[in-house]
Amino acid sequence: MRLHWFSIFILMTASLVLVHYLPFWKDVEFGDETTYLGSGLSFSIPFKGGVQWGPLYAAWYAFWHFFIPDSLNLYYFNWALLSVLAGISVFIFVRSLGVSLAAATWIAVLFLFSDQNVPLNPKISIAPFCLILGVLALIQLRPWSNSRRFLVISLVGLLCAYCRPEFYISFLLALIIAVFWLWKEKGILQPTLMRWAGVFVILAVGLHLLFGNPLFTGDDNRSTVAFQQHFVVNYSAWMNQPEPSTIEAQLQLFHKVMGENVHTLTDAIKMQPKWTFKHITTNIVHTVTANLTNVVSIFYQTLFRGWYSPWRMGVAAGIALVFLFLIDYKTTVRNFRKNPVDGWGFVGLITLLIPTLIATVLIYPRTHYLIFHLVLVLWLIAYVLSRLSLRKVKIMQPFSAAFLALLVLSIFVTIRVPEYHRKAPTPTADNVRFITQLTPKERLRVLERDWYRVFLKDNSDWIHVEEYTDGDFAKFVRDKNINFILMTQDMQSYFGKDAGFASFLNQYKSEGFVKLPTNSEGAYLFIKQSLL
């Protein structure tokens, strides 16, 4: 029992080390995550953000927003909380599969500090990642029948679908399997079977009524746009040319290569099979190599991060050789024979992962899809470790061996403290802090390329930079009634060669603007004097 408490202490300490100083070294990252944040800040039923844009994740943000009113603090809190929950979920999952306490703690801590955790953006993928690990652990720990197991798996698939819509496939597949087992087990489980099925139906129908169908919807299909964008990513690499910098340019290039009538993957297969086949085979190669890279990153790069001596490969090889020497191979083989794979449990795992396996092959192996492949990697590792038997070493009893492993892990966590207890430039967060301190007297009309408007206290109107086309920037500002222009480094680069903007720089005062520095990296704000 003391060993269990020591393990929990190490896991909690590692989590604290990882996130306690997060706002001081991690900058805000714009993109889909800030879209979800914005949906959470303005969350309502019916959900206005669109059923394919994570309504359940937006509700999660909305819940925490009750306790954390400041949007920037909410952003960092969510990032930290999900990072910690991911590590805890990994620990519970591998423990449920029979991995020893010390090994499970090591695996969880290495994941916590890996590049697959805190750096992962958008963070929304961690939510279904935790749900999947949680339900897979639950069906291992509870002596449930297969009908109950797949009802729970199906429900979790539906919950995940309201974070990432592709998981609706998991919901449907698990539901089909659950119906099969309900029919097969109806005679055995009659007293409680209908109660389980009834609860499932109520929850599933309720979620559909609240949010709608996340996959088969009349809204603009995210998968279609994602396919077009990521075909362009591959095409640009094949042609050894830079990727287009805007979504509009990406879609233009897609139709230039594939044809104006090609929109979906099905269209591409019919009309451009050669390009489509090359796209898919490229994705398969990238998926395999990326997953191998992630495994090496977690269990090697994370372990030796900060120590770049040429000896570290030798040390890693030495540790591996000692471990291989300590294995009792005869007993291990016997364990594999005695403990077969939980076949239907594995089917449940694959059912939950199928959408991401398909997505990486047909669309692109993006990091927020690959995180789910790690579930399969963890399962394989747990399958092997739970059946390994080590030789008995006279000088070391089982308890002392486990204690020593955890003691070494505690030293590893301590070494990580300086890496995460530091300050680093956070220019985007500094911009957010500056603009949220303002109290404008009128509604803001914002010209920007990022998502700063999400953090503004009051509602604002977003003017797209692509609307500026005539070369007279001052006239454009007047015509659009723009009163807020945040000139980040990205905006300065975007307008850097524009003569109309250069002219505006010399006359902004006459247009009623003042110029305010917003961070130490050279960003500044043009804001109408009348707003202050």
What are these regions (language model features)?
Residues V94, Q229-E243, A405-F455, S460-D472:
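Membrane-embedded, lumen/periplasm-facing catalytic core of multi-pass transferases
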Residues A102-T105, R148-L155, L175-I176, M194-V205, ...:
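Signature aromatic-anchored transmembrane alpha helix within multi-pass, membrane-resident enzymes
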Residues T35-G38, I169, L193-T264, T439-V454:
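Juxtamembrane membrane-water interface segments immediately following transmembrane helices
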Residues L22-S39, K48-W64, D70-N73, G218-A226, ...:
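Extracytoplasmic catalytic/substrate-binding loops of multi-pass membrane glycan-assembly enzymes
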Residues F77-G98, G134-L136:
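Transmembrane-helix motifs of polytopic, lipid-linked glycan transferases
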Residues N73-F77, L120-N121, T276-I350:
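Membrane-interface anchor segments at the N-terminal boundary of transmembrane helices
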Residues W5, V90-Q116, L131, S147-F150:
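Transmembrane-helix signature of polytopic, membrane-embedded enzymes
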Residues L41, I126-I132, C160-R164, I169-L173, ...:
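Hydrophobic/aromatic-rich transmembrane helices and adjacent perimembrane loops
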